[in-house]
């Protein structure tokens, strides 16, 4: 799949954070995947652990991880591919939960907490 000019700018702009906003089916997942892989292949970053990618859905985060893992394997970057499942690619809720769990004892919260869904919140209120 060839990149559009806008997608290519996203992939090749590695020295600044980006927000990618576009409609369904426009190639956001593909573009973010290519950007992450390009950052590793070019040596801009040394490890997939240096990536933070926030998506709106867990499904999209899973798809990005799957595609990045496949591209890294195909490019001979097996060690990095093995680390993708632990990469910081998630929803904003997933990222915040991960940070809270990592510091749960310091914060005085149960590290096995769950995030309340909308129905639970309504019940509690």
Task: Map each language-model feature to its residues.
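P-loop NTPase Walker
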Residues: 1-110, 115, 119
